[in-house]
Amino acid sequence: MEWSREREPWQSWRLHIVMDKLDLLVRFWELRVRYEALGMPLNKEERLELLSLLQLVAASDDARPLETIDPSQRGIPVQLTAGSGFLSGELKDLTYERLVVAAAEPLPIGHRTIMYLADAVTGIEYTLPCAVACSRNGSPCLVGLAPDGLPLRSHFTVPSSGLWRSPLGIGRTGIEA
């Protein structure tokens, strides 16, 4: 029992580092997609930011083979679109070219999905369009996702009334009732 308590701060510190890295990579992917795929001109500050981030990610580690990733390691909870529903999983590894998610079942290579991740501590949610680049069967399965589209980073809040409201603004809230 004592051993698990000592390990807890290390795990939360590691997860904090992963979230910071994800935040940086989402900004890199956003600028890269806007510049390369969408043809949207970047202003001077954004061009400098993209070049700086490119230097950072180019110097980072290469993606590890799926066989070397420990699926029992604690990850960050995520959701993936799969067929007509959602698939829960955990983000296990993260590089600028790939995200590795452990899930109950694999997704076919080439399948396009959207990964959703929310950080309750900072109040930030990420929506990342991806394509399945590789997968490994097992329990749990490991799915390698390649970023494929414009990611979205946004803040979320809980209404002060504590009641959820339709995103279309339809219906009454607890205050109006």
Model-based region annotation:
Residues 1-94, 160-177:
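N-terminal helix initiation/capping motif
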Residues 72-117, 139-145:
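Short strand-loop-strand
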Residues 95, 132-136, 149-151:
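A generic structural motif
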Residues 107, 140-161:
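Short solvent-exposed strand/turn elements
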Residues 118-123:
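Short, charged beta-turn/beta-strand-edge "cap" motif at the junction between a beta-strand
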